Regions:
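Single conserved hydrophobic/aromatic residue that forms the stacking wall/gate
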Residues: 1-11
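Generic short beta-strand segments
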Residues: 8, 36-41, 131-133
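Beta-strand-rich interaction surfaces with strong enrichment in secreted/lumenal proteins
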Residues: 12, 20-23, 106-118, 174
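Surface-exposed, glycine/proline- and aromatic-rich loop segments on solvent-exposed faces
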Residues: 14-90
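Acidic/polar low-complexity flexible segments
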Residues: 50-59, 63-75, 138-189
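An exposed acidic His-Trp-rich patch
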Residues: 73-119
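Surface-exposed molecular-recognition determinants
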Residues: 111-114, 135, 148
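Localized edge beta-strand/strand-to-loop motifs within extracellular or lumenal beta-rich domains
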Residues: 118-139
Length: 189
């Protein structure tokens, strides 16, 4: 099945919008994510989990898996380095411990070695297998027949062309991905 184009929205007045496509699926014990990105430059300065990956070429999945208002931010740079946070609001988020981040299987078309910004058009992909145990503040046993609130993002805060894209529109003036009130709905079969 061909990739469906991600609904894109630049939430800051910026003419630059990289091309981003993604797929999401689930198994009996994991969420599967695959992002394809084409952008004018690419950077992967962070190679250790729970670092500032959003400043690199980064894709993100935010979700409320248990319907209780507590959301997880799973952020991944273009070499598969991740950050996982949890909490009800932007402030005071708790980072996942190493034993949790280590559960996420990752693959990147650019390998896993950090590098400074490469100013050239680059296509890259990243795939993640996120076991339900990554939602470490909850006991998620299955997503079968469930609806969850979520959003998908592409950013590059410190690239030569900073950008902030979201799948579900964020209807505020300044970019803020930590707005679960603007999450869309995912329906799992």
């Amino acid at each position: 099945e061909p990739y469906r184009r991600q609904r894109q929205m630049c939430i800051r007045d910026s003419p630059y919008k990289p091309k981003v496509n993604f797929r999401i699926a689930h198994t009996k014990n994991s969420i599967l994510l695959h992002f394809k990105v084409k952008e004018a430059s690419v950077r992967a300065r962070y190679g250790t989990d729970n670092g500032s990956v959003w400043t690199d070429s980064c894709v993100e999945f935010f979700s409320i898996p248990a319907g209780d208002g507590v959301y997880y931010n799973i952020e991944c740079n273009c070499i598969g380095t991740i950050l996982i946070g949890v909490g009800p609001t932007r402030n005071g988020r708790e980072h996942a411990p190493k034993e949790v981040t280590d559960l996420v299987q990752r693959w990147s078309s650019l390998g896993d070695t950090p590098f400074e910004e490469r100013v050239e058009e680059t296509d890259w992909e990243v795939a993640l297998i996120i076991p339900y145990a990554v939602f470490f503040k909850h006991q998620i046993e299955s997503l079968d027949e469930k609806e969850i609130k979520a959003n998908f993002y592409k950013c590059g805060d410190e690239l030569q062309t900073p950008h902030f894209l979201s799948w579900n529109p964020i209807k505020i003036e300044n970019p803020d991905f930590h707005r679960p009130d603007f999450f869309g709905t995912l329906e799992f079969e």
